[in-house]
Structures are given as structure tokens and as C-alpha cells.
């Protein structure tokens, strides 16, 4: 009942966390909408400013260009309705030259208009005369042509239609559209921090990443300065910003071991494991398991029965020393993980980090580690001579618990130890190329898998085959320390598997006696063809 309550509390806490995340995302979305509204209002104000001057320009054009209203009334209607351009509809005041060669057409005067939108208020505008002197004349609209109806002549003058077309091709610098400049984006945290020149490069690195901090800057220099200041504030060593460019993933070849290690993602500053197995710890574990009572609440473990032997299910409330000692003794069948990882602090640091990373990968949901392990062999001084061999698989917990053990049995004999070693090898034989697993951690005595939506890859198959070498020849790994009598008994148990071929098998003249049933089973489970 207490376990169920803990599970319900965990689920409620997870729901609260999800609600908080959704609330933060909604707040960020509102801020983005507000920024977009501000930019849209700026754009609309620019359009309204242009609309204010268009009626005044059109009316002044009509006044200066029309000489005979009766003769040009039809053309003016066409101009007003937009069916005909101004330069084509109004032609009564085309430029004429006198005998002296002077142009008698008058320039369009726009005394009521400002000189330009961004100009300062002045009373006169200097105009250069033919003699090169400046003379003050009434303020003219510089953006307008001097002659509305002037056409391109042999002297190189341009018509109003040509000038209007050029204005359309070359937008005026007076009205700048928002969000039109180049931006550089700085990602201040996460492993991929740096400067990116395009939004498409940084978007995948921040989408769905909690706590990712980024900001845009108009220039590369400003982006570099911001990143350098952030690194100095965090106490980090500033990188070489001169060489900092948009990142491109480096395609480097990794060895099998490097690929397996990379999945753990452990930090170099993680403290080393200082746990040492001792007879006192072994006695403490046996005493706790023997003294367990069904009617008393226990947040550390509870015993179950597997193949006539007593195993335990570990909970996050377990003492770290008890948890790891029980694991080394081969007592652990399941490890249940909710949100706490402190009880794994005595495990190898890479093992614990792989478990935490898998927990985060599946959305921080309840996780279970199913362990198939052997019992260790101890020497006369009660030190481990052959460690427990473990095959563990991480998966999402389905909230189904094993029944309690009716009787606790911890009297382990040599036959039980060798049978448990054979059981571990049998578990590895059930993994084939169709299994949806991935190797997360591997050592001499432990291989840790995690469930995956994809079928097992070749690199993981090769890691499994390396792990199985100790069972096939018994000349590598932990089994190299087997005594002759122990090796002989284990060899007899392993002869039903096709992959087993030790020196004892080769020394027998008749060869290994492989049963028909065992041969068929090993043929189905052999994956040497994949290497």
C-alpha cells in the first residue's frame, strides 16, 4: 500500500511539472505574439504615412498639368480613376524651348509640403543657378520631379513615369520594413552553445529543450561580445571567438567502445566510486534480508522467489551501500526507479549515469531494471574470487510487482552458483537481431541494455558477442579464475550450447555430446553470422 501511495504521489508531481511547463510555454507564446503586434503596428504606421502624402501629390499634379479643363476633362477622369498614367493623360505642358534655348516650363512648386519626411524645418532650400551660385528659393519637395509632364528628350531628361518606375524598383530609404536585417543568434547554454547565423540552425537545438537560453543580435561582433560576457560571468574559460562560426557536426569515426561510452554521457568531474566490498557489508545484507517482515513497511526492498532462490526488488529508498552490496552478491532481480538516484551512488558512475540518462530519455517516467545475475564465488578470506555476472535490461515500469517470497533462502551452494552462471548465458542467447534493444553500458561482468523502438544494431550485437566470449572458452573475463573442478562442472552444463568450445571440450576424444534439443535451440540463437 505504501508503494502504491508513493507511486501516486510521483504521478501527481509529474502532472504538476507538466502543467508548469505548459504554463511557461503559454507565457512565452504570449510574449512572441506581443512582439509581432508591435512590429505589425510599425509597418502599418509606415503605410499610413505614405497614404497621407499621396492625395496632396495627386491634387498638385492635376493643378499644374491641366491648361484647358474643357479639352482635358475626359483625360482627367481617366487619370483620377487610374485607367491612364499621369504622364500619358496630361500632355498640354510638355517642355518647350525658346529661341535662346531656355526651358519655359515651370517646375512644380510644393510650398505646403515638407522638404522630406526626415528633414529638419528650414525656410529656404538652396538651388544652384547656371552661374554656379546658390540662390534661396521657396521650399520645394525634393522627392518630386521639377516637371510633372516632362518626357525623355535628346538632352537625357526622364519622364514622371520613368521616375515613378525607378522609385518602385529602388525602395526609398525613408520607410524601412521591420525584421529585414541580418541577425546572429547566440545559444548561451546546453552542450551546443555558440553563435549561429541562421534561425534554421538554432531552432532544432532549443525546441523542446528545457532551460535553453538564446538571443538574437544585429551583428557578429555584438553576438561574440555577449557570448564572451556570459562565459566570464559563469566562470568559464572564454573560447577563441575569432574562429567561432556556425557549427557543423564533425563526422568522425568512433570505435565500438567509444560509441558505447558516449551513450552514458558521464561528466569528468563526477567523483570516483570509493566503495569496497567487505565481509561486514555482506553480513549486513544477509541480516537485513532475513529480518524482513511482510507486515512491516519497508521502503528499501522486498524479497521474491525466482527459480527456488531468494532475490530482492530494490526501491529508491534503499541505502546505497546495501543496494550495491546486494547487487554484487547476485541478490537483485529488479531495480525500481521513480525520481531518486541517490541509492545508486555506490554503483559505477557510468552505470548510474546511463540509468539516469535513459530515465530522462523516456520522459522521466517510472523505470525498471530487470537483472539476470549469477551468484559470486568467494575465497577463504571471504573476498570475491569470481564476481556476479549480470545481464540487465532497462524499460518503462508497468507497475506490476512480483509476489512476496514465502520463504527466504540464502544458503548458496557451488551447484547453485554454476547453475546461475549458465542461466546468465541462457539469457544472452534469447537476444537476436530482431530484439529491440540498445547497449548502454558494458564492463567485464555486466552488460546493460535499454529498450529501443528500433531493432538492435550491429555495434550492439558485437558488444554482446564480446561479452559472451567468457562463456564460450572460459579463458577470458571473470571465469578465467575458475578452478579445475568448477570448470569441468560448468563445461558439462554449457555443452548443450553450440557456441561453447573450451579446452576441456577439445581434449575429449569424442567431442562435446550435444543433445538434439540443445543443438536446435543454439542454432536458432546463434548470431555469429552478423559479425
Swiss-Prot record:
Role this protein plays: Enhances the translation of downstream ORFs on polycistronic mRNAs.
Name this protein carries in UniProt: Transactivator/viroplasmin protein
Pfam families for this protein: Cauli_VI
GO biological process terms, semicolon-separated: regulation of translation
Localisation per UniProt entry: Host cytoplasm
Stated family: Belongs to the caulimoviridae viroplasmin family.
Gene Ontology CC terms, in alphabetical order: host cell cytoplasm
Gene3D superfamilies attached to this UniProt entry: Ribonuclease H1, N-terminal domain
Keywords: Host cytoplasm, Translation regulation
Amino acid at each position: 500500500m505504501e508503494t502504491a501511495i508513493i507511486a501516486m504521489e510521483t504521478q501527481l508531481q509529474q502532472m504538476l511539472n507538466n502543467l508548469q511547463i505548459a504554463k511557461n510555454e503559454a507565457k512565452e507564446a504570449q510574449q512572441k505574439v506581443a512582439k509581432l503586434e508591435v512590429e505589425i503596428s510599425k509597418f502599418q504606421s509606415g503605410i499610413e504615412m505614405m497614404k497621407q502624402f499621396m492625395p496632396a501629390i495627386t491634387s498638385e499634379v492635376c493643378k499644374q498639368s491641366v491648361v484647358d479643363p474643357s479639352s482635358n476633362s475626359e483625360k482627367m477622369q481617366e487619370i483620377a480613376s487610374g485607367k491612364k498614367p499621369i504622364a500619358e493623360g496630361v500632355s498640354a505642358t510638355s517642355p518647350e524651348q525658346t529661341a535662346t534655348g531656355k526651358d519655359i516650363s515651370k517646375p512644380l512648386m510644393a510650398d505646403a509640403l515638407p522638404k522630406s519626411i526626415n528633414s529638419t524645418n528650414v525656410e529656404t532650400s538652396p538651388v544652384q543657378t547656371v552661374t554656379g551660385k546658390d540662390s534661396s528659393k521657396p521650399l520645394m519637395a525634393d522627392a518630386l520631379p521639377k516637371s510633372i509632364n516632362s518626357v525623355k528628350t535628346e538632352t537625357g531628361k526622364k519622364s514622371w513615369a520613368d521616375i515613378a518606375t525607378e522609385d518602385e524598383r529602388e525602395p526609398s530609404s525613408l520607410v524601412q520594413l521591420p525584421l529585414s536585417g541580418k541577425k546572429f543568434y547566440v545559444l548561451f547554454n546546453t552542450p551546443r552553445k555558440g553563435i549561429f547565423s541562421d534561425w534554421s540552425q538554432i531552432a532544432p537545438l532549443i525546441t523542446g529543450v528545457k532551460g535553453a537560453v538564446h538571443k538574437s543580435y544585429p551583428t557578429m561582433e555584438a553576438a561574440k561580445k555577449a557570448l564572451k560576457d556570459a562565459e566570464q560571468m559563469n566562470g568559464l574559460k572564454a573560447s577563441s571567438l575569432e574562429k567561432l562560426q556556425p557549427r557543423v557536426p564533425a563526422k568522425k569515426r568512433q570505435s565500438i567502445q567509444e560509441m558505447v561510452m558516449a551513450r552514458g554521457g558521464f561528466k569528468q568531474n563526477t567523483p570516483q566510486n570509493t566503495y569496497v566490498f567487505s565481509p561486514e557489508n555482506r553480513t549486513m545484507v544477509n541480516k537485513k534480508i532475513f529480518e524482513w517482515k511482510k507486515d512491516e513497511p519497508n521502503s528499501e526492498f522486498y524479497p521474491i522467489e525466482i527459480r527456488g532462490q531468494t532475490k530482492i526488488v530494490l526501491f529508491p529508498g534503499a541505502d546505497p551501500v546495501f543496494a550495491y552490496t546486494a547487487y554484487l552478491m547476485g541478490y537483485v532481480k529488479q531495480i525500481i526507479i521513480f525520481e531518486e538516484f541517490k541509492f545508486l551512488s555506490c554503483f559505477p558512475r557510468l552505470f548510474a549515469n546511463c540509468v539516469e540518462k535513459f530515465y530522462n530519455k523516456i520522459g522521466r517516467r517510472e523505470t525498471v531494471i530487470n537483472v539476470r545475475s549469477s551468484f559470486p564465488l568467494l575465497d577463504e578470506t571471504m573476498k570475491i574470487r569470481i564476481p556476479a555476472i549480470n545481464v540487465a535490461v532497462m524499460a518503462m515500469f508497468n507497475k506490476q510487482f512480483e509476489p512476496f517470497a514465502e520463504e527466504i533462502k540464502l544458503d548458496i551452494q557451488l551447484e547453485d552458483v554454476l547453475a546461475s552462471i549458465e542461466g546468465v548465458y541462457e539469457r544472452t542467447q534469447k537476444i537476436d537481431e530482431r530484439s529491440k534493444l540498445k547497449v548502454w553500458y558494458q564492463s567485464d561482468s555486466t552488460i546493460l541494455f535499454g529498450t529501443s523502438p528500433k531493432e538492435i544494431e550491429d555495434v550492439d550485437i558485437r558488444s554482446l558477442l564480446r561479452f559472451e566470449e567468457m562463456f564460450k572458452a572460459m579463458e577470458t573475463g571473470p571465469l578465467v579464475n575458475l578452478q579445475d573442478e568448477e570448470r569441468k562442472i560448468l563445461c558439462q552444463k554449457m555443452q548443450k550450447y553450440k557456441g561453447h568450445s573450451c579446452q576441456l571440450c577439445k581434449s575429449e576424444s569424442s567431442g562435446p555430446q550435444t543433445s538434439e534439443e540443445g543443438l536446435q535451440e543454439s542454432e536458432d540463437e546463434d548470431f555469429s553470422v552478423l559479425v
